């Protein structure tokens, strides 16, 4: 039978999703736990690979097994053997025609960014950070240049293995949430005389696209932040896109605040569409 799993993880301690000789990847730990629970070797295929330091709220994998076990048994049994920062959220038997990657019609990511004169501490590794205030309107205007089908070569890592740089970005939303009074007081007390006042807040960038190139979201983030800080005008994003050269774009931004929200499937597969942890993001 074929089984699909929804997996959530904090990627800080791991070398990304895909199995490596080091054994310190999410896939390595998941397959080891599944193997111990099933008492046999288990090989998984995922909806979308994530890089070192990137988190996953609902990575979807599938595997084939001769064992017929209840969904709750796969969840609880596998989690028994997983480290505390990786957990199976749900399990569901699926038809043999289901493929976690090939059946996905889109993929979704979120980037959570802290704007504050004080670097994150408790949230270290879970949010990106900028010291300077960002212009939301400028970033919104820049983001509109990226919507639709484009050649995203300018936002592609040199080691990207995708067959084509042409992808479709369906949605890029940018929202802001103010931090609490304590954060505002801390921000004010850390400013030097003469510094411009800055509100402490969280920016949330959500991406939905047909598929994503290696480092594509982080490279777009680098450009959006450069525009938000006033280094470039919003129209610069179109110039970067048209250049089709990685050299034209801003540096790759930190992986810390990047979350793979999960794939999008046709409702007929009957799989959960969103992780409960989605509502916990700032």
Swiss-Prot record:
Homodimer. Formation of pseudouridine at positions 38, 39 and 40 in the anticodon stem and loop of transfer RNAs. The lineage of its organism: Bacteria, Pseudomonadati, Pseudomonadota, Betaproteobacteria, Burkholderiales. It is an enzyme of class 5 (isomerase). This is tRNA pseudouridine synthase A. Pfam families: PseudoU_synth_1. Belongs to the tRNA pseudouridine synthase TruA family. PANTHER family: PSEUDOURIDYLATE SYNTHASE, TRNA PSEUDOURIDINE SYNTHASE-LIKE 1. Transmembrane segments: none annotated. It catalyses: uridine(38/39/40) in tRNA = pseudouridine(38/39/40) in tRNA. Its EC number is 5.4.99.12. It comes from Delftia acidovorans (strain DSM 14801 / SPH-1).
């Amino acid at each position: 039978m074929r089984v699909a799993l929804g997996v959530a993880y904090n990627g800080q301690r791991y070398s990304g999703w895909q199995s490596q000789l080091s054994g310190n990847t999410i896939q390595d730990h998941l397959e080891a736990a599944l193997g111990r629970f099933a008492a046999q070797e288990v090989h998984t295929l995922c909806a979308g690979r994530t890089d070192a330091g990137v988190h996953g709220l609902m990575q979807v994998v599938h595997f084939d097994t001769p064992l017929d076990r209840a969904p709750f048994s796969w969840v609880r049994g596998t989690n028994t053997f997983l480290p505390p920062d990786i957990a199976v959220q749900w399990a569901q038997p699926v038809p043999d025609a289901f493929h976690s990657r090939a059946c996905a019609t889109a993929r979704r990511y979120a980037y959570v960014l802290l704007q504050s004169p004080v670097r994150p501490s408790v949230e270290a590794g879970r949010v990106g950070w900028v010291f300077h205030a960002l212009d939301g309107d400028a970033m919104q205007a820049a983001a509109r240049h990226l919507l639709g089908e484009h050649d995203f070569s300018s936002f592609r890592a040199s080691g990207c293995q995708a067959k084509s740089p042409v992808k479709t970005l369906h949605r890029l939303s940018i929202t802001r949430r103010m931090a609490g009074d304590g954060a505002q007081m801390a921000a004010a007390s850390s400013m030097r005389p003469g510094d411009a006042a800055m509100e402490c807040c969280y920016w949330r960038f959500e991406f939905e696209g047909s598929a994503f190139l290696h480092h594509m979201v982080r490279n777009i983030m680098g450009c959006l932040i450069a525009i938000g800080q006033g280094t470039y005008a919003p129209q610069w994003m179109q110039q970067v896109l048209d250049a089709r050269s990685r050299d034209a774009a801003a540096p790759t931004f930190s992986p810390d605040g990047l979350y793979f929200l999960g794939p999008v499937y046709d409702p007929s597969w009957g799989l959960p569409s969103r992780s409960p942890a989605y509502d916990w993001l700032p």
